[in-house]
Amino acid sequence: MLVIFYLGDGCLHCIEQLKAFSPVTQDFEAAGISLVAISLDTAEGLNKSLTTSGIEGGYPFPLLSDRSMKIFKAYRAFDDFENMPLHGTFLIDEEGMIRWQDISYQPFEDTAFLLKEAQRLLNQTKAPILAKEGEG
């Protein structure tokens, strides 16, 4: 799963990011990767995003609201010093492990790189880091 944390409909860079991921959503899904975007917008703001996106039918992935910023903070897409949310993009495997992340003041928009890297990371075999005592 690819989780995108964005600041909301009022953030032009965020909207550019969502529009960058929209046409390649099917490519990610073909690789077994679903997308979801989490915003600080209210439910009304999310509905506005869908109608003003300029994309027929709205975005091809769910938009969720995190007004309390609990999820932003749990993923550390939050600057404690500045007391403000950050842009975040996370690749999460089937076991819930974060395999790749980008947290920044700018949204991540290199969809081609991320698709290729996601396929590489998710297709790696999972080997134990250290052998258990008495093994090997």
Residue ranges of model-derived segments:
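Chalcogenol-based redox active-site neighborhoods
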Residues: 1-136
